[in-house]
Amino acid sequence: MNTIYRLTFVLLTLSGLAYAQQSMEACPLHAQHQAEKAKAAHQAEVNQRGAQAMGFSQTKTTHHFRLYADGGAIEVTAKRAKDLASRQQIRQHLQEIAQAFANGDFAKPQHTHVQVPPGVAEMTQLKTEIAYRYEPLRRGGRVRLSTASPDARKAVHEFLRFQITDHQTGDSDAAQP
């Protein structure tokens, strides 16, 4: 008798799980929920690899990517004004990438995003036509990317638009004057 109860329990459990799976897939928001979960998982991975590549916590800092008529800017700031450690780490990182990018070295963004970001091949090829200038900010720093070359500017904008999307900053992808 005990075996019959166990078998009944197992059958009811399995049929309930099968019904729940069908119900989830029939839910009109299921695909949206799955996409949101995937986006959150991707962001967590970007943050983890970013912390490794950049040397500071991605959750204690804020990234902004600005597009300008002559190029753009990468800005990183500490969320808390008194977070001096993050501010120093940001400044060190931005000084390093300004020099690395000028040399055509985009290893850190490639590590962070597990791919060669759009625009990098062209930025590497046109590296002598792009100026990378580090500027300190009160809570961090900025790398200003500027060029007179239309091809280099297009590559810089592609690169920054990718950063906006992958870091989920919400920054405008339209060039400002």
Located regions from the model:
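Bacterial N-terminal signal peptides that target proteins for export
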Residues: M1-T8
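Bacterial N-terminal signal peptides
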Residues: T8-G16
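Intrinsically disordered, low-complexity terminal tails/loops enriched in metal-binding residues
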Residues: G16-P177
